[in-house]
Amino acid sequence: MESTRTEAIVLAAMDYRESDRIVTLFTLQYGKVRGVAKGAKRSARRFGPALEPFARIGVELVVREGLSSLRGADIVTLYPGIRRDLRAIGLAGYAVELVDRYLPDGAPSPRLFRLLSSYLERLDQGEPLPSDRRFFEANFLNILGYRISLDHCASCGVELPATAERRTGASGMILCANCGRYGASVGPEAAALLGRCIATGRFGAVLFSPQSLREAGTLLDGAIAAHLTRPLNSLAFLKQIEPD
């Protein structure tokens, strides 16, 4: 079969047999692709360090149902700034695992590819900001069709004005104070900033206060977990280094 070339971000890689690796890629053209890189463990010329997690690469592959075949890869960037910072490593690992777990095989999403690329570039530039993680998550959910409705109660449907008290419900839903009397509070500031995350689409444009960051984090954590069958492997480590 004829090979094709596309840009990709490495989501995961594992050793396979004596000399091969199985690699999960998020490609710009084909979406998520799993493939075998034959001889990757011994061929520095064809692959080198290009198959490391969250590397951005140009990859030559033969796309097939099931496992594709990787013919070669060139490094666009390894994001060296990320690899020098423990918190950045944890956040990048969380982001690529989130994409891997949510995205089905063979479903291209150029918007999500740009979002993930922008987040990795942001992490590569220096000290990771807690607000950036929540910005990424809010836009991630929006792109995949899981946007949290901030304007109406998910239970009774009542409209929630900007100054209304909001509560978290099951599965990361927003409830009015009456329906969500036992849920955690989401104040007007947190709700407004979450809305701005979607509206601006630019890292660094939205900064949460410590309180609004906690409130938004509780809501987003619930919304993300609601669509997963098991916890993310990266989450336990991330919670140790990124408490908010």
UniProtKB/Swiss-Prot annotation:
Gene3D superfamilies: Nucleic acid-binding proteins (2.40.50.140), Recombination protein O, C-terminal domain (1.20.1440.120). It holds the Pfam family RecO_C. This is DNA repair protein RecO. The keyword DNA damage applies. Involved in DNA repair and RecF pathway recombination. It comes from Geobacter metallireducens (strain ATCC 53774 / DSM 7210 / GS-15). The lineage of its organism: Bacteria, Pseudomonadati, Thermodesulfobacteriota, Desulfuromonadia, Geobacterales. Belongs to the RecO family. SUPFAM superfamilies: ArfGap/RecO-like zinc finger, Nucleic acid-binding proteins. The keyword Ribosomal protein does not apply. One of its GO terms (cellular component) is bacterial nucleoid.
